[in-house]
């Protein structure tokens, strides 16, 4: 018996970290996927070639294996499995590798067990795994990997799928990441020390996200870049940017991008830039020191 499923990675356009405090956020699935295949086996093995992982244990753990171990505990029986994970994105890159892996594994386990409960339950189950492993997580990453396309997560945590022509977006990433759990904990500590200031910062991020959503619904991408720059300034004030992420952000702007910001938890990982009419220039400029790619959207969710 063998089953497989695939889920996309994502880029957060607006609202990362604020979304942990029930502020809205906008995310887009990108054409980089994680595919998981599970098959019956005499003992449990996990193979992730892109990470050089060949792991054998009844309860996989350590790094990204924590997400797999928790999924098996919650959504599988005790029978041994061979689990193979093909990842088209670097782990820890701010592009949602943990969420895409979790959603794809839950999809493969559901098919293996003959379950069919729809995307809402899949997203909820995957979100529970991220919370259990990370200590805190919004439903954003797991929702976008489940539903695909474009998602606006509102302040009541409702998933609103929508369509818009995002135009020319570029994603660039570093070779290292800031561990999401650690970055989320750092923002929580700053919130504890400066609750009023941080509360106002998150309120302002909410205004930026809602302005962007309103304009995208009108298919107006003109203010997108400037709104990204405003969001970046507030991410910097949350303490999640780094010298190198700031260098990438400014390299993209100097090459003509209308705006650019961190995408994901920060501390490392990736940036996103809106580059109307200058995608090639921005990719060329960023590729001098980092790894950049034109992001393709309108991507399917869990399949
Ligand atoms: N080379 C690696 N081997 C195993 N686990 C890794 C490796 N690189 C990153 N990880 C783990 O992968 C997970 C990535 O999840 P996260 O930090 O949420 O980043 P993202 O979701 O943005 O990709 C983390 O648990 C991290 O410890
Ligand atoms: C920082 C946060 O808003 C997004 C984290 O994204 P990623 O795990 O770095 O891809 C956390 C969350 O939404 O759970
Ligand atoms: Mg993650």
Swiss-Prot record:
Alphabetically ordered keywords of this record: ATP-binding, Cytoplasm, Isoprene biosynthesis, Kinase, Lipid biosynthesis, Lipid metabolism, Magnesium, Nucleotide-binding, Transferase
Subcellular location: Cytoplasm
Record has Nucleotide-binding as a keyword: yes
Residue numbers annotated as active site: 141 (proton acceptor)
Protein name from the UniProt record: Mevalonate kinase
Annotated pathway: Isoprenoid biosynthesis; isopentenyl diphosphate biosynthesis via mevalonate pathway; isopentenyl diphosphate from (R)-mevalonate: step 1/3
GO MF, one annotated term: mevalonate kinase activity
Cofactor needs: Mg(2+)
């Amino acid at each position: 018996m063998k089953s497989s499923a695939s889920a996309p990675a994502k880029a957060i356009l607006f609202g990362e970290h604020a979304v942990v405090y029930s502020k809205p956020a906008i995310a887009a699935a990108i054409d980089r996927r994680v595919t998981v295949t599970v098959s019956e086996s005499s003992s449990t093995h996990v193979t992730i070639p892109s990470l050089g992982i060949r792991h054998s244990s009844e309860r996989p753990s350590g790094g990204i294996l924590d997400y797999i171990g928790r999924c098996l505990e919650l959504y599988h029986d005790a029978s041994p499995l061979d689990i193979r994970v093909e990842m088209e994105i670097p782990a820890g890159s701010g592009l949602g590798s943990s969420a895409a892996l979790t959603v794809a594994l839950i999809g493969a386990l559901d098919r293996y067990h003959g379950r069919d409960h729809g995307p809402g339950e899949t997203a909820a189950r995957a979100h529970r795994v991220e919370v259990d492993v990370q200590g805190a997580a919004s439903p954003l990453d797991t929702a976008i990997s489940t539903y695909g396309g474009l998602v606006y997560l509102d302040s009541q945590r409702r998933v609103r799928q929508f369509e818009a022509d995002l135009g020319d977006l570029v994603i660039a990433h570093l070779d290292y990441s800031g561990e999401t759990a650690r970055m989320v904990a750092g923002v929580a500590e700053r919130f504890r020390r400066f609750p009023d200031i941080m509360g106002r910062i998150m309120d302002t991020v909410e205004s930026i996200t809602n302005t962007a959503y309103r304009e995208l619904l009108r298919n107006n991408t003109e203010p997108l870049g400037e709104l990204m720059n405003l969001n970046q300034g507030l991410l910097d004030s949350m303490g999640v940017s780094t010298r190198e992420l700031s260098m990438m952000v400014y390299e993209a702007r100097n090459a003509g991008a209308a705006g650019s910001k961190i995408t994901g938890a920060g501390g490392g990982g990736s940036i996103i830039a809106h580059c109307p009419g200058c995608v090639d220039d921005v990719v060329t400029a960023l590729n001098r020191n980092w790894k950049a790619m034109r992001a393709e959207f309108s991507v399917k969710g869990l399949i």
